[in-house]
Amino acid sequence: MSKHSLIENLKKQIEPIAEGLDYELYHIEFVKEGKENYLRIYIDSENGVSLEGCEKVSRAISELLDDIDPIQESYYLEVSSPGIDRVLYTDKHLEKYKSYNIVLNLYSPIDKKKKYEGELVDFNENEIDIKVEENIVTIPREKISKTTLKGEL
């Protein structure tokens, strides 16, 4: 099974578990770091994510994973909040954070810059518009390597 298929299959099964515990499934990734594999589950909630909440979701997901055994290799399960400087992966994430400050990292420079910071104004399937100082800058999505919420306390 490909990594993409694995993630999609896990999303379908983990999402109802997270929702049943009053959390949103924000993102899933399966990564290798050094010699170790990690299944990382990011959860979110309107009320924030506590350590106890992560533990509760982790136990429920762990039971599911023990039952369905979707990953043949050994791995560590990690459940956490996406954090204040969270990556915005989907249109749903972009919609939620319209009018917030974001950081766009680019694959290659546009106007000699590989990083743009500004207020998320709008987006569509092809572009993201951000307000930088008083100017609207339109960046093609294909040029963006990562979109991150600019965490501000």
Swiss-Prot record:
User: GO CC terms for this protein?
Assistant: cytosol
Q: Which InterPro entries match?
A: Ribosome_maturation_RimP, RimP_C, RimP_C_sf, RimP_N, RimP_N_sf
Q: Does the keyword Magnesium apply?
A: no
- Primary site of residence: cytoplasm
- Give any single GO term for biological process: ribosomal small subunit assembly
Q: Which CDD domains match?
A: YlxS_C
Keyword vocabulary terms for this entry = Cytoplasm, Ribosome biogenesis
* Pfam families the record matches: DUF150_C, RimP_N
Compartments it resides in: Cytoplasm
Superkingdom per UniProt: Bacteria
* NCBIfam families per the UniProt record, alphabetical: PRK00092.3-1 (NF000934)
Function comment: Required for maturation of 30S ribosomal subunits.
Q: Tell me which family the UniProt entry assigns to this protein.
A: Belongs to the RimP family.
Spell out the protein name for this chain: Ribosome maturation factor RimP
Q: Which organism is it from?
A: Clostridium botulinum (strain Kyoto / Type A2)
